[in-house]
């Protein structure tokens, strides 16, 4: 948890230092790969049903470091040159809890 690393604590998961730290932890890459694969499978069904939006949530204790870095990496992996049913995938990360820390 970057919260316990003094030089990372004041930064967010949007900074390269925190993002690199979070994404290099054991199991994180596999978790993100599994999550993005699930999203791609779900998306096909959503399209068949005529739905245009999927909302995903990623959370952690403080909402400042881990969830921010992981959500942004999910956006990067899901949108990077990907198409679904011939349509480009558009994704965005909304970091609800950034700025709320005490």
Please describe what each predicted stretch is:
Residues 84-100:
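Short beta-strand-centered segment that lines the nucleotide-binding/catalytic pocket of NTP-utilizing
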Residues 24, 71, 85-86:
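Serine/threonine-rich low-complexity intrinsically disordered regions
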Residues 1-54, 79, 97-102:
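C-terminal accessory "lid"/substrate-recognition subdomains
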Residues 50, 64, 86-88:
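Recognition helices and adjacent regulatory flanks at domain boundaries
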Residues 74, 78-82:
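Hydrophobic alpha-helical packing residues
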Residues 52-75:
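Catalytic cysteine-centered active loop of the rhodanese-like fold, especially the PTP/DSP P-loop
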């Amino acid at each position: 948890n970057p919260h316990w690393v003094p030089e990372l604590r004041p930064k967010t998961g949007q900074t390269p230092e925190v993002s690199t730290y979070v994404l290099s932890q054991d199991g994180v890459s596999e978790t993100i790969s599994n999550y993005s694969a699930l999203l791609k499978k779900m998306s096909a069904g959503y399209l068949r049903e005529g739905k245009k939006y999927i909302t995903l949530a990623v959370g952690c204790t403080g909402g400042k470091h881990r969830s921010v870095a992981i959500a942004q990496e999910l956006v990067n992996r899901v949108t990077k040159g990907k198409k679904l049913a011939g349509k480009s995938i558009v994704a965005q990360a909304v970091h609800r809890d950034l700025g709320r820390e005490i």
